A protein has these predicted regions:
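Nucleotide-sugar donor-binding/catalytic module of glycosyltransferases
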Residues: 1-133
Length: 133
């Protein structure tokens, strides 16, 4: 069996303020065999140009009119997925560096896999980001 590929579906709409942090968190992953599929709902800000500026072949961007239904964006993204596993990441979220490696270890130990986990909620305040932990 070849190296496992993760397809990461990222719905976006006017996410220019957050999309860099989201994509940068993927570029920092300790496991590098992934593809990011950004599905943009015709943003009116710089979201699409920011995504395209990365110039990394693993990061793709497609447009959709999802009529405000984010599930349409996720389902559309799945049609482009080439990976062995599909992951969802919102454009205003980011992952810790070992996220995919941790998922891979679990996938290798279990035949049928659906992974979910807790999250940390961060809010921006005057002195930076603060966690709910």
């Amino acid at each position: 069996m070849g190296k496992i590929l993760f397809s990461i579906i990222i719905p976006s709409y006017n996410s220019a303020l957050f999309i860099r942090r989201c994509l940068d968190s993927l570029l920092k992953q300790t496991y590098s065999n992934w593809e990011a599929i950004v599905i943009d709902n015709h943003s009116t800000d710089d979201t699409v140009s920011i995504v395209k500026s990365y110039g990394d072949s693993r990061i793709q961007c497609y447009l959709i009119h999802n009529e405000g239904v984010i599930a349409k964006s996720r389902n559309y993204g799945i049609t482009f997925a080439k990976g062995d596993y599909v992951c969802f990441l919102d454009s205003d979220d980011w992952w810790k560096e070992n996220k995919l490696n941790t998922c891979l270890l679990y996938c290798n130990l279990n035949e049928e896999v659906f992974i979910y986990h807790q999250f940390e909620l961060y809010r921006e305040e005057q002195r930076g980001l603060h966690s709910n932990k």
